[in-house]
């Protein structure tokens, strides 16, 4: 439902170009939620790895403002990141050294991974529209 709502609202209010920019930049706060969890759960040892991951996803988001495949790849790479957190926090696993990644609320990793997959699939279907919008704006000299 969250992915369907995101698609419906974004298509209702954004042009194709602005939609790409929005979802590319939205990857940054999506990754940033893990910093909020780090603070909330007081996982002091997790700050370095979590902040590094946010920086990596921020690069994908910033590049994705202009390059559609960077948005797709960024959201797809976020899926295993969600899965590792869910597995470590709730399945008794330790895919990474325990305490190096933050805890997450029950089910958050599954929710986020599902959202990321559905949105990446949607972005794949929209990539040609996004490219066409950028080409048209360059041809016409418009910015948005």
Where are each of the predicted segments found?
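Short, conserved "active-site rim" segments that organize catalytic pockets and cofactor/ligand binding
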Residues: 8
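Membrane-interface helix caps and helix-loop-helix hairpins in membrane proteins
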Residues: 13-18, 37-46, 65
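Hydrophobic core segments of alpha-helical transmembrane domains in multi-pass membrane proteins
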Residues: 49-55, 73-76
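Functional transmembrane or membrane-interface alpha-helices that line membrane-embedded catalytic
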Residues: 1, 11-12, 20-28, 52-69, ...
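Membrane-helix boundary elements
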Residues: 25-43
